[in-house]
Amino acid sequence: MFTGIITGVGRISAVQALGESTTHGKRLTIEAPVGYLDDVGLGDSIALNGACMTVTTFSVEKGEFTIDISAESLDKTSGLDNEGPVNLEKALRAHDRLGGHIVSGHVDGIGHVTRFEQVGESWDLRVMAPPALGKYLAY
């Protein structure tokens, strides 16, 4: 579980194919901020741009970790298939403060942005979600 609050910004520094086909997914290497991986272990969950991923290797010394992402997850997310910046959030622990919301980080469907407009110092964002997901949305 996650709060949905970004705790660091990393950088996807390498993208490798898993297998000979794009249907096998990809392995991403992520450079993390200094000290970010100090309490991370193999198999821990870290959300990348809000999507829950599993740490497959990590190096505190190098400040980087890898995740293997399936073709399905690549299809249902954005910003995870090319090198560049990525938002990071470590999974909650039982004793952590809930400073945001409780979210799973699991993708249940794809929405489409229908409006993105600045209103004063805020932004009005409207997303059209598949009807089957309506029962899970608060609005």
Regions found by a protein language model. Name each.
Residues 1-139:
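Conserved loop->alpha-helix
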